[in-house]
């Protein structure tokens, strides 16, 4: 029996967000009963839904209540309906990026795991993926070109132009590098740092600082790769990677490549953390408005993100392990949602997958 009370802010958002979040509720309720944990969940508006109802993609009440919680469980935001409004009011920018900055969520963590029994999910040849996958992509989340100033547009006709600024401070690189190396110490003790140090000054600083941080972890091997080479090596020999450390832009791109290697972005979870282990947990995929409301979305990424919440913010690793075991047990038993059902495999819907995984948690 755990006597602590944990408050989780639930932000379902737009598109498939609400329906995959319903499956996360099933997992939370199952965990509460199985492990006798006091979990209080409260739902708040975010994204396009909040913009339509309250005039902001991130209402002040949502931020205020997130500040009082132990963690945020996030669905998805955005969709075509809000694509043509002012960019700072668009759900992706006005909600998600603002939350990252507000809570100083500088660490983005995406585990890419595929046991040998499930290598048929990967689009790669069996001989390439024969050892399965077990790597983690660590992405610096609130620095780099997405947040650098100035940025904007100017000029008219042939002189029309746009500009962004890539900037990294030493402290931003140091703190994310320390996190990556500490994580690697608990795993296979290998960090691959991604940059473009043959061209970009930000990457030159990145490589220098990461190398300096590495000296504090003599038992961890450091490898530097240019981002273009890294994208090729991930296809050629993904099993060689352990912890991948990336600046914001490169991490954004490579982590999605990792998702496809894994079989589907619908099974890839994500955690965004600050130095106090407060985190926002969300599926790596988007709001998928084209399949919203059809009960065919894959809830596994949302469920595995819930597992990460227990591991990193609530420090209940045994709960996280149980959830993860239930997910991979369901997949090993042959249950598939439409996006990962191949060779005429019968697929189950969103609700059924949530029920199956919840029932397996009870049995483990």
Swiss-Prot record:
It catalyses: (2R,3S)-3-isopropylmalate + NAD(+) = 4-methyl-2-oxopentanoate + CO2 + NADH. Its cofactor is Mg(2+); Mn(2+). It comes from the Bacteria. One of its GO terms (molecular function) is magnesium ion binding. Mg(2+) binds at residues 228, 252, 256. It is found in: Cytoplasm. One of its GO terms (cellular component) is cytosol. Catalyzes the oxidation of 3-carboxy-2-hydroxy-4-methylpentanoate (3-isopropylmalate) to 3-carboxy-4-methyl-2-oxopentanoate. The product decarboxylates to 4-methyl-2 oxopentanoate. This is 3-isopropylmalate dehydrogenase. It comes from Blochmanniella floridana.
């Amino acid at each position: 029996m755990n006597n602590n009370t944990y408050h989780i802010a639930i932000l379902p958002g737009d598109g498939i967000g609400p329906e995959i979040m319903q499956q996360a509720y099933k997992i939370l309720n199952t965990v509460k009963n199985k492990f006798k944990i006091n979990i209080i969940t409260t739902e708040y508006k975010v994204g396009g839904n909040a913009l339509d109802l309250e005039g902001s993609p991130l209402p002040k009440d949502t931020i205020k209540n997130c500040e009082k919680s132990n963690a945020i469980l996030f669905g998805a935001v955005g969709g075509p309906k809000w694509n043509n409004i002012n960019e700072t009011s668009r759900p992706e920018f006005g909600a998600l990026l603002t939350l990252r900055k507000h809570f100083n969520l500088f660490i983005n963590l995406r585990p890419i795991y595929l046991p040998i029994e499930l290598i048929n999910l990967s689009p790669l040849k069996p001989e390439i993926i024969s050892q399965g996958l077990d790597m983690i992509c660590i992405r610096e989340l609130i620095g780099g070109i997405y947040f650098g100033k100035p940025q904007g547009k100017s000029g008219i006709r042939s002189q029309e132009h746009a500009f962004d600024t890539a900037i990294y401070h030493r402290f931003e690189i140091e703190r994310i590098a320390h996190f990556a190396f500490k994580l690697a110490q608990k795993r296979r003790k290998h960090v691959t740092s991604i940059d473009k140090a043959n061209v970009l000054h930000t990457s030159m600083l990145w490589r220098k600082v990461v190398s300096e941080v590495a000296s504090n972890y003599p038992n961890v091997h450091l490898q530097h790769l240019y981002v273009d080479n890294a994208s090729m090596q991930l296809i050629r020999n993904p099993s060689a990677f352990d912890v991948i450390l990336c600046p914001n832009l490169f991490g954004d791109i490579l982590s999605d490549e990792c998702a496809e290697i894994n079989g589907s972005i619908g099974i890839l979870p994500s955690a965004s953390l600050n130095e106090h282990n407060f985190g926002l947990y969300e599926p790596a995929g988007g709001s998928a408005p084209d399949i919203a409301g059809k009960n065919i979305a894959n809830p596994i990424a949302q469920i595995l993100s819930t597992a990460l919440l227990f591991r990193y913010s609530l420090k209940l690793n045994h709960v996280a392990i149980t959830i993860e075991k239930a997910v991979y047990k369901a997949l090993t038993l042959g249950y598939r949602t439409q996006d990962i059902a191949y060779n005429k495999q019968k697929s189950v819907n969103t609700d059924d997958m949530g029920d199956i995984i919840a029932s397996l948690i009870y049995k483990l």
